[in-house]
């Protein structure tokens, strides 16, 4: 529910709960500095995301929140690995910066304990039905979470589904 009625351009994977920002929302092509519009999207998205994952009901189940950068297949693997890592790092830096007032310092402290930022280059490119790489959809930043206990995966999926369906 938190994101279903939102004007944010994102995709929620129904199987994993990972949230992907559409191509071009956060970054210009081949850049890692967050665009002004991307900053606005993060200011809207992060408080909602944190409210769901780190509320009293859920926070004890979350072992890690992952910001994962992905690129298209244009250019070398190493170039894209560097770019995807820089993008993920820039998002983490923006969220945890003192200037980011949309979440409390207490929430930032909780995040610092479990937040990671990783780059994947083009190792998880998005493939269309015809077998070709969708370069635009491959350029993305994903927000993922890991649970402390494998059996809790199903519990959290139910919780997120309930939140999404409200």
What are the roles of these predicted feature ranges?
Residues 1-64, 148-166:
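Periplasmic peptidoglycan-binding/tethering modules of Gram-negative envelope proteins
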């Amino acid at each position: 529910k938190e994101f279903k009625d939102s004007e944010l351009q994102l995709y929620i994977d129904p199987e994993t709960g990972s949230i992907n920002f559409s191509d071009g929302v956060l970054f210009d092509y081949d850049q890692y500095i967050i665009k002004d519009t991307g900053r606005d999207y993060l200011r809207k998205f992060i408080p909602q995301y944190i409210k769901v994952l780190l509320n009293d009901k859920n926070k004890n189940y979350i072992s890690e929140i992952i910001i994962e950068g992905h690129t298209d297949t244009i250019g070398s693997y190493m170039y894209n690995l560097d770019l995807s890592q820089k993008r993920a790092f820039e998002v983490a830096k923006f969220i945890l910066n003192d200037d980011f007032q949309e979440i409390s310092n207490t929430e930032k402290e909780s995040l610092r304990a479990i937040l990671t930022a990783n780059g994947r280059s083009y190792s998880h490119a998005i493939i269309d039905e015809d077998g070709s790489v969708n370069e635009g959809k491959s350029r993305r930043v994903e927000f993922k979470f890991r649970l402390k206990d494998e059996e809790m995966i199903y519990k959290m999926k139910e919780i997120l589904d309930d939140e999404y369906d409200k």
